[in-house]
């Protein structure tokens, strides 16, 4: 019974919704926050069909702390608008966010987008919930056949107390090189407040399976990790381990609605 429970929880954990190759996660063994079009909304501009995605994320292996995400994208002509609702936390601590995104494809190699989110935080002992907001522009371009450059920034008004909110600014620059049909190499730089974090790693792809390895060079606590993804019948399964974050796992489901994307003349 114990092993059966572990197997069930393994299947129902983190969010790794299956994606096209151009929007696949650049995260390497859970050491990167630059991932997919749920984060950097500019990637959603490349979608060809309406997509509905559902996923569950477990931050630590078999822990209470988890996140549920519902995401839907509507591509039309060169413009894609998306909506996301996510709930993070456990019974005594919860963060709820609702996000709307807009992305435009300027050329087949370049897209930009912006998203705005409303944040609501509540914990046991607080009389009322605390709220904030987040604005996040994103951009990506292929400046050579297999060279992808992506930029992403966040401006967050985070609730600290009922009387005080704090503005937090962060920016990410990521470079991805497709070495061949099997191997992708990614490098990322993150700046938040006065902290600088560098990340790098690689992904090895074999049809529906991919292996990720990488390292994070943080000023105080460097870390390394590895993980894998499996895509099958519009499901996506993922698990990864990071030396500073522990083991995380995920399950995602994506439904494509077979409408054709029409382009304005």
Give the role of each language-model region:
Residues 14-18:
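Sec/Tat signal peptide C-region and signal peptidase I cleavage site
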Residues 1-4, 108:
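Positively charged n-region of N-terminal signal peptides that target proteins for export
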Residues 3-13:
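Sec-dependent N-terminal signal peptides
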Residues 19-265:
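Subset of outer-membrane beta-barrel
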């Amino acid at each position: 019974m114990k092993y059966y429970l572990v197997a069930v929880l393994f299947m129902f954990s983190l969010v790794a919704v299956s994606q096209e190759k151009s929007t696949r996660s650049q995260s390497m063994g859970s050491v990167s926050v630059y991932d997919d079009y749920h984060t950097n909304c500019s990637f959603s501009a490349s979608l060809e069909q309406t997509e509905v995605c559902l996923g569950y994320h477990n931050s630590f292996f078999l822990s209470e702390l988890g996140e549920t995400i519902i995401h839907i994208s509507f591509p039309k002509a060169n413009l894609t608008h998306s909506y996301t609702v996510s709930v993070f936390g456990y019974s005594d601590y919860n963060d709820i966010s609702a996000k709307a995104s807009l992305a435009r494809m300027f050329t087949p190699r370049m897209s930009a987008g912006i998203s705005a989110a409303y944040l609501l935080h509540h914990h046991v002992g607080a009389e009322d919930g605390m709220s904030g907001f987040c604005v996040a522009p994103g951009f990506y371009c292929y400046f050579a056949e297999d060279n992808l450059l992506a930029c992403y920034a966040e401006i967050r008004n985070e609730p600290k107390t009922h009387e005080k909110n704090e503005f937090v600014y962060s920016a990410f620059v990521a470079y991805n090189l497709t070495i061949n049909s099997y191997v992708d190499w990614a490098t990322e730089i993150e700046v938040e407040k006065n902290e600088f974090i560098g990340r790098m790693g690689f992904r090895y792809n074999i049809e529906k399976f991919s292996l990720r390895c990488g390292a994070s060079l943080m000023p105080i606590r460097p870390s390394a990790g590895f993980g894998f993804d499996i895509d099958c019948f519009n499901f996506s399964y993922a698990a990864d381990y990071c030396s500073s974050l522990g083991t995380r796992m995920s399950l995602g489901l994506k439904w494509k609605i077979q409408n054709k994307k029409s382009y304005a003349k």
